[in-house]
Amino acid sequence: MDTYAYLAHLTEDGRTQTILEHLKGTASLCSAFAAAFDAEAQGQLAGMAHDIGKYSAAFQRRLHGGPKVDHASAGAFECLKAQQLAAAFAISGHHGGLPDGGGRGDAAGTGTFWGRINRASQGRLEDYHAWQSEFSLPHANTPAFAGTRLEGMFFTRMLFSCLVDADYTDTGAFMDNSPYLPASSSSMEELWRRLETYVSGWFPPKGALNMQRCAILEQCMSAGAQYGPGLFTLTVPTGGGKTVASLSFALAQAKARRMKRIVYVIPYTSIIEQTAQVFREIFGDENVLEFHFGVQFDQQEDDASSPETAPLTRSVETWDVPVIVTTAVQFFESLYACQPSKCRKLHNLAQSVLIFDEAQMLPLPYLRPCVWAIAQLVRHYGASAVLCTATQPALDPIFQEFAPEIPIREICPMAEAHWESFRRVSFQQAGTLSWMDLAARLQQQEQVLCVVNTRRAAREVFHQLSGSGNFHLSTLMYPAHRRRILDEIRRRLRDGLPCRVVSTSLIEAGVDVDFPAVYRELSGLDSILQAAGRCNREGKRPPEDSIVTIFQGEDPPPRLFETSIGAGKIVLDHCQDVSSRAAIHTYFSTLLDLKGAEAQDAHHILPLMESEFFPFRTVAERFHLIESPTTTVYLPLEEGAGLVELLRSGQYSRTLYRRLGQYGVSVYPQHLAALEQAGALEHLEDGSVVLRDIGLYTQTTGLTLEPSGGNALFIG
């Protein structure tokens, strides 16, 4: 047996990789990845120990078609014997996902960490001890900052990320018969030169508004070069150019401090495409990754999705490019996930600049876990965090609780007079309006935007408008369709043609349109101010002629919005100037007070992590920013028809899924069931869902969720 070669992988053409070769390759990568947060030794240990269980005769038979073998528990057991808990957990989950810790008394063989360890301690694993004749495990110490349960759990997930990426990468390099090469992309210095070229046309600025925007941009560039990693706010009024300004800060800091990448986190999928497109124009396609539901390649967590089958997913799963644009859902759910594919990218958040656009949109029921995770990345993983918004939320007390030693700096301090220079609208209140009365008011105006709280209300108001120049926007329209309508809206606004738009809130965040008048259904003050940002956006009309009308609709407010609407009403009733910084601060403070600290962690994520032993799987099951997970239904319309045909033929690729995302609509479970019952859907082999009944989609209002002619099923 001394000359027996224990194998880790075997290709169809007969090439072999020994276990020792794989362990050394994985350990080298894992150590390099973990170096970003000073955990090289932990990475080396996890990499060398993760596949020790493959040193069994049973696993060697598995390579030739034998039954499945638990090869992860052996390495976990050896690391635990060495008192290296983080490495033990990471190894335990490197194929099936991080388990719940459970308790020491768990029955051997149960799915918890202790159940697996107890099985190993009772000698119920296949004999794997041949590894001891080939190498010994390296020594490692757990970083001091990972001493508490909360911080230890976060560190373990980050180490797990390093191990998964290293394991998949080394295996993929062997299976592809090509050495691992980091993603080919430009340096931060080169990206900075491209940014300078992009903004050079803005100088010298013309007009007062552009002068203010350029001043903000220059201040952000200067602050980025001046400050090291930390916690920052960027409070810029709507129209102040905060997207490029925040990017400029991040790039200046990344260049000056040799940071690795910029991650731009956006609340809505509906605006991610346009932001990513701007970044591609600045930096080039090869330097920007757009990551959300429409571009993911779904991969199941079992042996069938081991590294051998992962080439389609590498760039999406690793985030190893300089600029990533993603959604808050993907970002935060990954930070609390337990699956290998979702966690693989996490180590690349270390030494990165994280920009949270529209930070006020962080969902209240998950606010404390979200803020805690940001604080962890800044405190212990060399990241910078920028909370970027035109309506800064009162998050300071929560950050001070979780990161008391880190000051929160405002990147661009705005004196009240400076803020006033961006005032472009006046507000008025209209009380309660029926949908008929509202439509009559809109009909009297040539160009007007109306934003309501639900998709049902948007349809009802839209259908009561008559004549030409009327448009409807909602998330029931696929992105390419919405973009085409927005292009037509902008053209009509520019040419002075009739243009009445009824929309849900999707138009509020970052959509570049400029109306002379806006109606906004009563909502949270942040939403009201976002809607106001679509009125007189370029400052070409006097504020007194640019009216934002706040009204109460005929439907009761959706339960989801009750608290924010209540806080907004308090501010409207008591603050003379609802757009002042004082009113904004009052709103967010009131919003947090109305719910209290417990409502900011409604699913008790942080208490669970403190009281239980590393409950990875339970936390992942609880942490869903969107309470009702949606399913993407693809529309075989326009280019989407050909793309769906490619899916049907099995031609899966990242590019295909990204392009298909432009022809997808997110549908909630109850609506999906209604469409299913009506026979309106087709399910493809890769799990994709396609609308079979094209008659359910109209060019005016998008997807109809009432296929049987019954009551409509709409949500906000």
Predicted regions and their residues:
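Conserved helicase motor
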Residues: H9-D13, T269, E290-A304, N453-R456, ...
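SF2 helicase catalytic motif II
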Residues: A328-F332, P340-H380, A385
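Inter-Walker segment of RecA-like/P-loop motor cores
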Residues: G284-Y336
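C-terminal helicase lobe and adjacent C-terminal extensions/tails of nucleic-acid helicase motors
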Residues: A87, V378, D437-Q445, V451, ...
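Walker A/P-loop
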Residues: Y227-A250
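Accessory nucleic-acid engagement/destabilization modules that flank
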Residues: M1-T197
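Interdomain hinge/linker at the junction between the two RecA-like core domains of SF2 helicases
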Residues: A390-Q443
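Conserved Walker A/P-loop ATP-binding site and its immediately adjacent core
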Residues: M259-F283, H292-V295, A394
